[in-house]
C-alpha cells in the first residue's frame, strides 16, 4: 500500500525533531544532575540559582572550566608611528596571557576580555553544527541524484545530533525552565499550524500576494537581527519583534503543510520530495522555537 506524501514527510520530520529535541532534553537533565552533584557536564560547570517562579535555574559558569594560561585581549590605540594615515587614529588588538586566576582578574579590571566564553567541547559541537547545516542546505537544494536521499538523511541526522547540545546551551543561557516551556509551545503551535495548513480550507500556498508579504517580513526580520547585533534595541522592541517573528514562522508552517496538498494534487509522492519538504518545515519549526525563546528572554 502506497503511503501519502504527508505520511512520508511527517515520518522524516518526526524522526529528526525527536533527535534534536530528545538530545536537548537529555542534556538539560544531565546538566541538572551534574550541578546537584557539584560536577561538570560536557565541559561546563554550573551555578545553582532560583528564578522568579521558585524553580531551580542553572547558570553556566565558564570561569570554573578555564585552563591557564588564559588568552585575553582588548582594543587599544596604535602608536602614532604605526598609523598609515598620520591624521587618522588607528587601533589594534592587544593580547596577553594570564598565568592564573589572579592575573586574569587584574586583566579584566584593565579592560581585557576573556575569549573563552564557550567550553571547548561545546564550541566544537557548535562548529560541526554550522558546517553540517550548511552542507545540509546545499544538499537539499541541488537537483535530485542517485544518492540524494541517503546523503540528505545522513547530513540531516548528523546536524540534529549536533543541534541538541547547542539548543540545550541556548536554553541554559536563558532559563532552562523557559526553554522547556518554549519547546512545548513550539510543538503545540506546529501541530495546530500543520492541521490548519493541511485541512485546505484556504489555498495558502498558491496565494502569491501572501508569499510576497511573508518574504518581505522575513527579510525585515533578518535585517533587524543583523542591526541588533551591533546597535542593540530595547528589550520591549526585541520582544515585540520576536513575537512577530514567531507569528511569521507559524504562517510558514501553515503554508508549507498546505503545499503538501498542492504537490499531492500533482501526483508527486516520492521520498526525495518528502525529504525536501520535511527539511523546509523543520527550518520553520526551529526558527519558531528560537523566536519564542527570544521573546521569553526579553520579557
Where in the sequence are the language-model features?
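A hydrophobic alpha-helical transmembrane-helix feature that marks the membrane cores
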Residues: 1-299
Amino acid at each position: 500500500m502506497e503511503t501519502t506524501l504527508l505520511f512520508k514527510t511527517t515520518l522524516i520530520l518526526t524522526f529528526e525533531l525527536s533527535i534534536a529535541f530528545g538530545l536537548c532534553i537529555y542534556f538539560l537533565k544531565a546538566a541538572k544532575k551534574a550541578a546537584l552533584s557539584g560536577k561538570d557536564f560536557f565541559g561546563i560547570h554550573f551555578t545553582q540559582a532560583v528564578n522568579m517562579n521558585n524553580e531551580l535555574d542553572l547558570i553556566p559558569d565558564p570561569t570554573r572550566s578555564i585552563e591557564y594560561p588564559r588568552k585575553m585581549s582588548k582594543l587599544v590605540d596604535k602608536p602614532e608611528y604605526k598609523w598609515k594615515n598620520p591624521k587618522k587614529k588607528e587601533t589594534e588588538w592587544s593580547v596577553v596571557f594570564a598565568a592564573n586566576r589572579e592575573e586574569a582578574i587584574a586583566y579584566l579590571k584593565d579592560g581585557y576580555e576573556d575569549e573563552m566564553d564557550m567550553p571547548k567541547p561545546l564550541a566544537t559541537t557548535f562548529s560541526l553544527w554550522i558546517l553540517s547545516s550548511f552542507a545540509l542546505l546545499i544538499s537539499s537544494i541541488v537537483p535530485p541524484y542517485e544518492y540524494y536521499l541517503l546523503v540528505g538523511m545522513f547530513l540531516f541526522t548528523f546536524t540534529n545530533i549536533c543541534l541538541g547540545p547547542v539548543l540545550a546551551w541556548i536554553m541554559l543561557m536563558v532559563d532552562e525552565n523557559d526553554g522547556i516551556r518554549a519547546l512545548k509551545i513550539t510543538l503545540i503551535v506546529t501541530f495546530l499550524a500543520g492541521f490548519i495548513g493541511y485541512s485546505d480550507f484556504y489555498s495558502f500556498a498558491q496565494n502569491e500576494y501572501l508569499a510576497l508579504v511573508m518574504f518581505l517580513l522575513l527579510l525585515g526580520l533578518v535585517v533587524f537581527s543583523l542591526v541588533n547585533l551591533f546597535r542593540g534595541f530595547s528589550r520591549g522592541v526585541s520582544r515585540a519583534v520576536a513575537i512577530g517573528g514567531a507569528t511569521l514562522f507559524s504562517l510558514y508552517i501553515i503554508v508549507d503543510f498546505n503545499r503538501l496538498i498542492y504537490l499531492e494534487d500533482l501526483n508527486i509522492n516520492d521520498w526525495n520530495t518528502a525529504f525536501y519538504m520535511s527539511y523546509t518545515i523543520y527550518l520553520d519549526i526551529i526558527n519558531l522555537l528560537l523566536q519564542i525563546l527570544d521573546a521569553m528572554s526579553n520579557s
